[in-house]
From Swiss-Prot:
UniProt site positions, description: Transition state stabilizer: C148
Catalytic activity: 5-(methylsulfanyl)-alpha-D-ribose 1-phosphate = 5-(methylsulfanyl)-D-ribulose 1-phosphate
Gene behind the chain: mtnA
Organism: Pectobacterium carotovorum subsp. carotovorum (strain PC1)
Annotated pathway: Amino-acid biosynthesis; L-methionine biosynthesis via salvage pathway; L-methionine from S-methyl-5-thio-alpha-D-ribose 1-phosphate: step 1/6
EC number annotated for this UniProt entry: 5.3.1.23
HAMAP family noted in UniProt: Salvage_MtnA
UniProt record, GO biological process: L-methionine salvage from methylthioadenosine
Keywords of the record: Amino-acid biosynthesis, Isomerase, Methionine biosynthesis
Name this polypeptide is given: Methylthioribose-1-phosphate isomerase
Length: 342
C-alpha cells in the first residue's frame, strides 16, 4: 500500500503505525500495529480513539493484512474481531460494512486497499465540509466551549467540532475557546489543549465542573461537541459529560451544536436508549495514568461507575452540523434521521 500520513495514523513500508494518544502531550510516540490483536489493544486502551479514526485504523489494517496474504476467511474473522472492539462508535461499524463488501469481491485484495484509501480521503473531505457549515453558525467575537477531543487526532482531516473552531478562527471569529478537561481520561486537557495550541487558537483549560459557572457569568456564546453515534430520532451518544453540558446550555439559553460526519448517523438505532454504552475500568476513576506516571487518590476498594459515553436527547440540541449540511430541530421532527443520509 502507498505511504500515508495523517495526524494519528501513518503507513510506512506496508506497516500501520498509530500515534499513542495516551502518551500525549508529554511524548509523541508512534507504535506499530502489525496485527488485529495489537489494534484491538490500542483501541481498547484508547491509544487509538475518536469515532472516525477507529474506523479508519481498522479499515487500513484489514487492507494491509490482505496484502500480506491472509485468506478471505481469515480476513472475515479479523473484521468481526475489530467490529467488537468499541461498541458505541458507529463509524467503526459503517466502515467495516464497506470493507466487508470489498472482501466479497473476486479481486478482494485490490478492492480492500482501494476501499480503505477511499475512506481516508472521504473523511478528510467530510471534515472540510463540516468546518465550512459550522463556521457559518459562529458569530464574531465568540467564546466557545468544547468537550473531549474532536480534532485531527480523532480523524484523518482537520476534525469535526475542532475543525469548526479552526475554520471560525481562520475567519477571525473566535475570541476564546474554553476546553473542558474531560474526566476521567482528560482528553480535553491532554489532547484538545495540545491541538489548539499547535493550531494557534486561543484557549483556556477548565475543570468540567467549572462550565456551569462560566455560562452563568455569560462567558460562553456556544458549545460545540462531536458525536460517536446519532440515532434515528436525533439523540446523540458522545463522551461522558456531554449530556451535562447540554442541560446547562438549555437552562442558560446557549446554542448547543453537534458536529459529525453523516457516517456517524445510525438510522437502524431508533433512539438513545438503544445505543450500547461502554463501561470502562474502575482504575480510570480512582486515579490517573499516562506518560507522566500513575497516581491513585481514591481508596483501593472504592466502588466505581465509569460509563465512557452518555446520551444527549435531541430536544437539547440546537443543530446537527454534518458534512451534508446543518440539520435543524424542525428537520429532526420531520424525520430526516429516519433514513440513510447522503
Amino acid at each position: 500500500m502507498q505511504t500515508l500520513n495523517t495526524t494519528s495514523l501513518k503507513i510506512v513500508d506496508n506497516q500501520l503505525w498509530i500515534l499513542d494518544q495516551q502518551a500525549l502531550p508529554q511524548e509523541k510516540c508512534w507504535r506499530p500495529c502489525p496485527d488485529v490483536a495489537s489494534l484491538v489493544e490500542h483501541i481498547q486502551t484508547l491509544r487509538v480513539r475518536g469515532a472516525p479514526l477507529i474506523g479508519l485504523s481498522a479499515s487500513l489494517l484489514l487492507a494491509l493484512l490482505a496484502e500480506k496474504g491472509l485468506s478471505q476467511a481469515e480476513l472475515a474473522q479479523a473484521l468481526e474481531t475489530l467490529r467488537a472492539s468499541r461498541p458505541t462508535a458507529v463509524n467503526l461499524m459503517n466502515n467495516l460494512d464497506r470493507m466487508k463488501l470489498a472482501l466479497a469481491q473476486p479481486q478482494f485484495v485490490a478492492a480492500l486497499v482501494q476501499e480503505a484509501l477511499r475512506l481516508v480521503e472521504e473523511d478528510r473531505a467530510l471534515c472540510e465540509r463540516i468546518a465550512d457549515h459550522g463556521a457559518a453558525l459562529v458569530k464574531p467575537n465568540s467564546r466557545l466551549l468544547t468537550h473531549c477531543n474532536t480534532g485531527g487526532l480523532a480523524t484523518a482531516g482537520i476534525g469535526t467540532a475542532i475543525g469548526v473552531l479552526l475554520r471560525a478562527h481562520q475567519q477571525g471569529k473566535v475570541t476564546q475557546v474554553w476546553v473542558d478537561e474531560t474526566r476521567p481520561l482528560l482528553q480535553g486537557g491532554r489532547l484538545t489543549a495540545w491541538e489548539l495550541g499547535e493550531l494557534g487558537i486561543p484557549y483556556q483549560l477548565i475543570c468540567d465542573s467549572m462550565a456551569a459557572s462560566l455560562m452563568a457569568q455569560g462567558q460562553v456564546d456556544a458549545i460545540w461537541v462531536g458525536a460517536d453515534r446519532i440515532a434515528a430520532n436525533g439523540d446523540v451518544a458522545n463522551k461522558i459529560g456531554t449530556y451535562s453540558l447540554a442541560v446547562l446550555a438549555h437552562y442558560h439559553q446557549i446554542p448547543f451544536y453537534v458536529a459529525a460526519p453523516h457516517t456517524t448517523h445510525d438510522p437502524a438505532c431508533p433512539d438513545g436508549r438503544a445505543i450500547p454504552i461502554e463501561q470502562r475500568a474502575a482504575a480510570e476513576v480512582t486515579g490517573v495514568s499516562g506518560s507522566f506516571g500513575h497516581c491513585q487518590w481514591a481508596p483501593q476498594n472504592a466502588a466505581v461507575y465509569n460509563p465512557a459515553f452518555d446520551v444527549t436527547p435531541a430536544a437539547l440540541i440546537s443543530g446537527w452540523v454534518l458534512d451534508t449540511g446543518v440539520v435543524t430541530p424542525q428537520d429532526v421532527k420531520e424525520g430526516i434521521f429516519q433514513n440513510t443520509l447522503k
